[in-house]
Amino acid sequence: MIKCTRRIDFDAGHRIIGHKNKCQFLHGHHYVLEITIAANKTDKLGMVIDFGLIKNLAKKWIDANFDHNLILHQDDKEIGKQIENYTGQKIYYMRNNPTAENIAIHLKNEIFPKLFIDQNFFVTSLKLYETQNCFVEV
């Protein structure tokens, strides 16, 4: 199996409903996402994937939905609607708390399979860094 990894940076805010410490409040992170894609063999050009394709598909989705935006739990729509009305931005809502773990699972299991449909490769893992020192891997 041959693996290729592409890094994508983005800035986003979130809060964790029910958290007992400061993460219960709106705050932001400079996230770094590492997408690892694998295939059993290379294509006729000798590649698993053109890194530009990852950028064009994954980064485009990240930029449109997460970058410089708020990622909130769907139960946080009251505060989200107030922010949307005030700023005009479209908040991204998730079914679960927008922890690094849940964001990575959401991207790997729900978003990226749709973006990379009908390809000869698959996403094997995602690493999502919430800080320089803390990341999750799915």
From Swiss-Prot:
Please write the reaction equations for the catalytic activity of this protein: 7,8-dihydroneopterin 3'-triphosphate + H2O = 6-carboxy-5,6,7,8-tetrahydropterin + triphosphate + acetaldehyde + 2 H(+)
A Pfam family matched in the record: PTPS
Q: Which UniProt keywords apply?
A: Lyase, Metal-binding, Queuosine biosynthesis, Zinc
Check the record and name the InterPro entries matching this protein. Answer: 6-PTP_synth/QueD, 6-PTP_synth/QueD_sf
Question: Some GO term, biological process aspect, for this entry: which one?
Answer: queuosine biosynthetic process
| GO MF, one example | 6-carboxytetrahydropterin synthase activity
Further comment found in the protein's record: The active site is at the interface between 2 subunits. The proton acceptor Cys is on one subunit, and the charge relay system is on the other subunit.
The domain of life for this entry's organism is Bacteria
Q: Which cofactor does it need?
A: Zn(2+)
Give the residues annotated as active site.
23 (proton acceptor), 68 (charge relay system), 130 (charge relay system)
- Which Cys-Cys disulfides exist here? none
PANTHER family associated with the record: 6-PYRUVOYL TETRAHYDROBIOPTERIN SYNTHASE, PYRUVOYL TETRAHYDROBIOPTERIN SYNTHASE
UniProt family annotation: Belongs to the PTPS family. QueD subfamily.
**Descriptive protein name:** 6-carboxy-5,6,7,8-tetrahydropterin synthase
Cofactor binding: number and manner: Binds 1 zinc ion per subunit.
Residues the record lists as binding Zn(2+) = 14, 27, 29
Q: What does this protein do?
A: Catalyzes the conversion of 7,8-dihydroneopterin triphosphate (H2NTP) to 6-carboxy-5,6,7,8-tetrahydropterin (CPH4) and acetaldehyde.
The region annotated as signal peptide is none
